Design a protein with these regions (language model features):
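Acidic, low-complexity, intrinsically disordered interaction modules
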Residues: 25-71
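Negatively charged, low-complexity tracts enriched in Asp/Glu with abundant Ser/Thr
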Residues: 1-26
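A detector of low-complexity, intrinsically disordered, Ser/Thr/Gly/Pro/Ala-rich segments
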Residues: 1-3, 16, 46, 52, ...
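Short, compact, well-ordered microdomains
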Residues: 65-86
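Compositionally biased non-globular segments, especially hydrophobic aliphatic-rich helices
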Residues: 7, 55-57, 79
């Protein structure tokens, strides 16, 4: 089973952002930031994006690995085949 383990919450992001450790790595990326935001003026209303990151939450590129049109870290991680480990 592919698992995503929460490492830490990030404070300087809009919405809710968390660093996860992926096991096994996804496309060579062991750490990702999953960011959920509300978009009141968008037809989607909310979205969650996944970005490759360091363990500290630094994002070298804002090219997203995945996007889902809902406010859910679990749904975004499931879209790339991972289950959040509790």
């Amino acid at each position: 089973m592919n698992t995503a383990t929460k490492v830490k919450n990030l404070r300087r992001w809009s919405g809710e952002a968390t660093v996860y450790r992926l096991d096994p790595p996804y496309r060579g990326e062991e750490y990702v930031v999953v960011s959920s935001i509300h978009l009141p003026k968008s037809p989607w209303k909310e979205e969650t994006m996944i970005f490759a990151s360091t363990e500290a939450g630094e994002v070298p590129s804002y090219f997203d690995l995945a996007v889902v049109k809902e406010y859910s870290h679990a749904a975004a991680l499931a879209s790339i085949g991972y289950e959040v480990k509790s």
